[in-house]
Amino acid sequence: MIYETDEKAVPLQEEINYLKDYVALEQLRMNDPNSVQFSYPENTSELIAPLILLPIVENCFKHCDKQSPDIEISIELRDTKLQLIASNAIVKTDNSDQNSGGLGLENLEKRLSLLYPERHKLTVQVTDESYRTTLMIDLRV
């Protein structure tokens, strides 16, 4: 996938394959690899901006409760509308900056605004126990 990042769009299936490899790699580092659930469509033909989904998936592993991550990642595609929902367990502390969203999501929002103006929605929900990011993109050309 790295060699394709100069492209404006790559097949969604290749992006999903890249995410599958990333998730598998992260699972190798975990005490309980079964604490990760990842669902996705098979054999899609849509195109998507390269590596646009990766920051959300990375955040699941970066900010999860290391003792009990409970990571769930779901990608759904209906016609040209893609929905990614990623959630993970967190350990909430008084000085936690998890409500801020972070630089990664801020940069992702800017990139989405350039690539999918008026065709995307990125939301973050934080509770005492979990962090959930939802991304919706209309992939129509």
Predicted segments with their positions:
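C-terminal end segment of the histidine kinase catalytic
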Residues: R140-V141
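Two-component histidine phosphotransfer core
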Residues: M1-Q125, S130-T134
